[in-house]
Amino acid sequence: MADPGGAKQGGDDKAYLWRLHRIFALYVVGVVAFLALMAWAEQRGLSRHWIGPIFLFLTVMVYAGIGVYGRTTDPEEYYVAGRRIPPIYNGMAAAADWMSAASFISLSGALYLQGFSGTPGQAGGLAYLLGWTGGFCLVALLIAPHLRAMGLYTVPDFFHVRFGGRWPRIIAALAAVLCSFTYVVAQIYGVGLIASRLTGVQFEIGIMLGLGGVLLCSFLGGMRAITWTQVAQYVVVLLAFLIPVSWLAYKQLGNPMAPLVYGAQLGKIADMEERLLDSPAEHQAVVAYLRRARDFEARLQDVEGALERERQKARERVRALRDQNADVGLIVSASRELVSLPRDAASARERWTREMRENYERARPLGGLPLHSQAFAGDPNGSPHERKEYELARRNFLALMFCPMVGTAGLPHLLTRYYTAPSVAAARTSVAWSLFFIALLYLSAPALAVLVKFEVMQNLVGSSFETLPNWLAQWARVEASLLSVEDVNGDGLVQFGEIRLGADLIMLATPELGGLPYVVSGLVAAGGLAAALSTADGLL
């Protein structure tokens, strides 16, 4: 959405607001019409090899077009968008700024892997949701109004005025740059991951495409262009998150209001978890992972000797296959295994240590995942060790909730957003709108984690390896660490402990996991791209 003409009316001017509302409504209608058109085209036979690139390039071009249209050379417009952004759109832009690739892609995945409270050794789950949303309460009460009242341009300016001298400003600038650089790396990774999955291009090329879009969106128009780009991106993010979770909820429960009805699936998941804990096949998988872990542990006792033995085994396998005139595919696979062995003892030690830990972690009930609905690890009424573990888990949960809360309140790319408000009161209202728009997604994240886990346990566990869907192999080719399904107990059936899903995969693979049309997969990927680009815009 572009700044409509750059007219100098105040943020409260009715004609100015009406024009904004009209342009925003037209944009939303256009997005919905585009989705309907793509769904119709898919039904008419449009290949998914075209759907993915269309979603990627069209959305990036729209964002870039808004950035070019919003270009300006006025310093007031460039740094603070003329201080005339209405609170509702400021809140929408702040929500998009906050909804990074980590929130959009990984939040539901973290809840899937950690349950509601996290693992015994690492707190997590809902602590992130509570901490991040609580941070906006601190911003509304303690920070945003005071920043806007000073009428400055940047956070270092605030430190210069508040504390005086040169060093506070330099320290604030260095902290902002360090924080932004660290955070933007995750966004660029998300851009590369999504672009490579949508179009099939290499990961590095996907990163370059995303960076080009970021530059066009932010550098020509500054905060003015970024604001309206982020408003447009929030619409895509919202639709991309709510449509799949609502579709899954309707498919499983007959009601699309996922945050209100997903509790019914928690009881079913608890029953499935109990059956999996008693399953002989699951126990066999645990034993297989334990055997692997001990094998890696034995290799680490003599790394150089073990590496030489592994190389010799791989060479003999390749030689035997060639002597038998085996299938070319088998020979190529064996040759790849030989080439993929560590090059030296140092890299072998590093890899085998990592794999030993991973296998020990998976050699636990439910593949190392906690019971999803468990409040905290341990048992307040159990043994002394269980009571101690319970108290430690509670304290870790509260500590983890506090840290993101304070961290959110200090993020520089969020704080500068409230310099664009017309007044101090508008800054407070902007934070309230931010919290509302963020809550629309965050309330659905726990529901999505539960619905996806039910889908995995109900439809994927127990299926034959010969009939696994193609999307599993496609995602594994994008990034091997995202997904692994391996028949470790040799029974030919998928066990829950044999499935490893990365946190970054849960959201992106939800449409395919739930059997939704591919156009929804394209929308989810476009939403993840919008989330990454919106945060990268604000950071850069």
Language-model-detected regions and their locations in the chain:
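Hydrophobic alpha-helical segments and their helix-loop junctions in multi-pass secondary transporters
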Residues: 38-40, 64-71, 180-188, 196, ...
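Membrane-interface "cap" regions at the ends of multi-pass membrane proteins
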Residues: 2-104, 218-221, 332, 336-369, ...
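Membrane-interfacial loop-to-helix junctions in multi-pass transporters
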Residues: 85-88, 162-170, 199-209, 393-394, ...
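Hydrophobic, small-residue-rich membrane helices and short re-entrant helix-turn-helix hairpins
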Residues: 10-17, 151-163, 167, 222-234, ...
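Interfacial loop-to-helix junctions that mark the boundaries of transmembrane helices
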Residues: 43-54, 115-130, 195-205, 386-401
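Small-residue-rich segments of transmembrane alpha-helices in multi-pass membrane proteins
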Residues: 32, 87-94, 163-170, 233-247
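Membrane-interface helix-loop-helix modules in multi-pass membrane proteins
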Residues: 65-66, 77-152, 301-346, 361, ...
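Helix-loop-helix module between adjacent transmembrane segments
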Residues: 13-31, 95-96, 100, 122-221, ...
